[in-house]
Swiss-Prot record:
Gene3D superfamilies per the UniProt record, alphabetical: 1.25.40.420, Potassium Channel Kv1.1, Chain A (3.30.710.10)
Keywords: Ubl conjugation pathway
Superkingdom as given in the UniProt entry: Eukaryota
GO BP terms in the entry: protein ubiquitination
Lineage, uppermost ranks: Eukaryota, Viridiplantae, Streptophyta, Embryophyta, Tracheophyta
Protein's recorded name: BTB/POZ domain-containing protein At4g01160
SUPFAM superfamilies: POZ domain (SSF54695)
Cysteine pairs bridged by disulfides in the record: none
Domain comment quoted from the record: The BTB/POZ domain mediates the interaction with some component of ubiquitin ligase complexes.
Naturally occurring in which organism (per UniProt): Arabidopsis thaliana
Domain BTB: 111-180
Length: 527
């Protein structure tokens, strides 16, 4: 038999007076006036659980392991602090008689408006509990009055009763009788409160083996911050984030109603994902704004949530300059926050590709806050340089990775983010085409006018397509022309580089520089 107190099986000693040296009275309390909450949605469920947790925290005293003794009453009150969790322990002198069930109502009420619903008494071994929990070790060995007492009273909230009893049994047996995920989460939380690391690890391992659901993943991410930081819990919370990110990976298949019903931790998990498939970061931002406005009606509250919680997950450097300009003139953020975010984004856009890679390298891959990393955008980000005189014109830079180009074979396309020229919305489209004269596949580039503009709008544009090439690394002109655009129309070149597809994708192709194809479009309005 393993005689190690930290790892042995001592279930035979649980609540057995022959193997115990102390009596633990557990007072089950409940705040007066607390009503029942009926949860009708996922967000209500998550919020009610958090509210319940905060209520338990608020009705106990803040603690820094201090002692307030009253020698006349022959008792003292110990309050222990474990991160954000507070546990109140009343230690009573051994010679003091336990209170009978006939105590009056005033004695049944604590001084912080909580009532004692019931009392359980357990015979405990201080050695076993101290070996499992630094909380109990400090309680039994601090050299003060309470460490010498044979009876102590532990006050817990009614919502914690089952979990605390399971925890105490675990400290003797290294096993749990509960199997439901919600019950294991409750045990995990009280194990954190009483610093029973072995139970935290045990609960996490059991939960990791269970099928993840949206409800369970949201509850995991809504755990207290101190618990989320525990090493034994991190694999569990990482799995919860990955589950939510995978479930909402393709945003085009998710209804807006479903997104709006998610709590804050759910939205954060979605936004933190690099693999989020969405048209552009502009669309990500619009979704975030809708969510914030649906959950926070007060402007100041929206600004606080956006600035303190959600901004870290938004990839502002990959938003269009038009959208960044709107952020500066809107009240979405506090002015100082908006300026900082937009300036940082614009500076990133102007950096060389090499320096952008340096900034990306400085971001931790495991971090949930990745400001510079691209997502799996349906519409690829661009760089744009605009001129107002002598006539409206712009230079568009579109970079495509070799794998992205290979993915459009034999007949697909990649579209860029929208940009504005002459008051109209345009986009670039890289395509794999069939050259009908030579009957070969080839790489083509087109410019198109958005279909959501005015039906009568028309604008004449001079366009010039070029591509960067080895060995000079300069842009070389490939195709140019003049075209009068109307809504939904596009123009371009089916074989921009004048070579077959297999030569274009070959390793020695001069147009791929470090496996990146650099395209440029010079556009100007003909007045």
């Amino acid at each position: 038999m393993d005689l190690s107190l930290s790892g042995g099986d001592f279930r035979f000693a649980f609540n057995n007076v022959n193997f115990s040296d102390r009596l633990l009275r557990i007072e089950i309390t409940q705040s007066s006036g607390e009503g029942e909450v009926i949860c009708s949605s996922i967000v209500d469920w998550a919020r009610d659980r958090k509210r319940r947790r905060e209520d338990v925290t608020n009705h106990t005293n803040d603690a820094t392991c201090h002692v307030e003794s009253d020698l006349n009453k022959n008792s003292c009150e110990i309050v222990n602090e474990n991160s954000n969790n507070k546990t109140q322990v009343l230690v009573t002198a051994a010679e003091q008689e336990p209170k009978s069930g006939g105590e009056d109502e005033n004695e049944r009420l604590t001084n912080n408006n909580t009532s004692v619903l019931s009392v359980q008494e357990l015979h405990i071994s201080s050695a076993i509990l101290a070996a499992k929990s630094p909380f109990f070790y400090k309680l039994f060995s601090n050299g003060m009055l309470e460490s010498e007492q044979k009876q102590m009273t532990l006050k817990i909230d009614a919502s914690e009763e089952t979990a605390v009893m399971e925890l105490l049994k675990f400290m003797y047996s290294n096993s749990l009788s509960v199997t439901a995920s919600s019950a294991l989460l409750d045990v995990l939380m009280v194990a954190d409160k009483f610093e029973v690391a072995s139970c935290m690890k045990y609960c996490s391992q059991l939960l990791l083996k269970m099928p993840m659901t949206l409800e369970s993943s949201l509850l995991l991410l809504d755990l207290p911050s101190s618990l989320l930081m525990a090493d034994s819990v991190k694999p569990l919370t990482n799995a919860a984030r990955q589950f939510i990110a995978s479930r909402y990976k393709n945003m085009s298949k998710i209804t807006m109603e479903e997104l709006m019903a998610l709590p804050l931790v759910g939205i954060e998990a979605i936004l933190a994902s690099d693999g989020l498939e969405i048209q552009s970061e502009d669309v990500v931002y619009e979704v975030v704004l809708k969510w914030v406005k649906s959950h926070y009606s007060v402007l100041e509250a929206r600004q606080e949530v956006l600035g303190s919680h959600l901004a870290r997950y938004i990839r502002f450097p990959h938003m269009t300059t038009d959208r960044l300009k709107k952020i500066l003139t809107s009240n979405d953020f506090r002015p100082s926050v908006a300026s900082k975010l937009v300036v940082e984004a614009l500076f990133f856009k102007t950096e060389s590709l090499a320096h952008q890679h340096v900034l990306l390298a400085h971001e931790q891959p495991a971090s949930t806050s990745r400001r510079f990393a691209k997502r799996a955008y349906v519409h690829r980000p661009i760089k744009i340089v605009e001129f107002a005189v002598p006539r409206p014109q712009c230079i568009i830079y579109l970079d495509l990775k070799r794998k992205e180009c290979e993915s459009i074979y034999p007949s697909s396309r990649i579209s860029s983010q929208q940009f504005t020229l002459g008051g109209q919305g345009f986009f670039l489209s890289a395509q794999c085409n069939m050259d009908h004269l030579c009957l070969i596949h080839c790489f083509g580039l087109f410019i198109g006018m958005q279909e959501n503009g005015s039906a009568s709008a028309s604008v004449t544009v001079d366009y010039d397509f070029s591509v960067r090439s080895k060995p000079t690394m300069e842009f070389v002109g490939k195709f140019k022309g003049i075209y009068t655009f109307t809504r939904g129309k596009a123009v371009g070149c089916r074989n921009l580089l004048g070579i077959p597809w297999d030569i274009f994708t070959a390793k020695n192709c001069p147009y791929f520089i470090n496996d990146v194809l650099h395209l440029r479009a010079d556009l100007s309005i003909r007045l």
